[in-house]
Amino acid sequence: MSQESNSSSQVFSSPVERIYHAWNDALSRNDAEALTAMYAPDAIIESPLVPYLMGLERPIRGREEILAFWKLVAARKPNIRQYYRTGYLTDGKKLMWEYPRETPAGDQMDFVEVMELNENGLIQRYRVYWGWFGFGVLKRDEYHR
């Protein structure tokens, strides 16, 4: 089995494992540029945050829109987030994980995140599914800091 590493010299067994760890690390640092670099040039993001943050009624496409999206997410996301994750599922090209997350008010929101990687190990498609409580949080504008 081949191994990959990132800039911190951590060794990963696959592109999926590398993306999983690098993506979560970049998100925790609010690093929109590092997040965007993990996406294919023509990648697509589908998330309930797209219409909420960008006012679009369609998925976002391409690195320019993806960078704008992650900058908006970074500006609105709470500094302290509690995640309770237990790993991920993969078939080698698709990466999926589910986790509950605590809101700034202390409520629990549930998410499922799905990434499809291309042949170059970049994210081609990213979809986020929110549990029912999450939509109320968006509607009440309680997602931000």
Model regions: which residues?
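A solvent-exposed, acidic/Ser-Thr-rich amphipathic alpha-helical stretch
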Residues: 13, 32-34, 38-91
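Short charge-dense sequence patches
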Residues: 14-26, 60-66, 121, 126
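Short, low-complexity N-terminal intrinsically disordered segments enriched in polar/charged residues
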Residues: 1-37, 41, 141-145
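Short hydrophobic/aromatic segments of transmembrane alpha-helices and their interfaces
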Residues: 17, 48-49, 105-106
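A beta-strand edge to alpha-helix "cap/lid" segment located at domain peripheries
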Residues: 2-11, 67-145
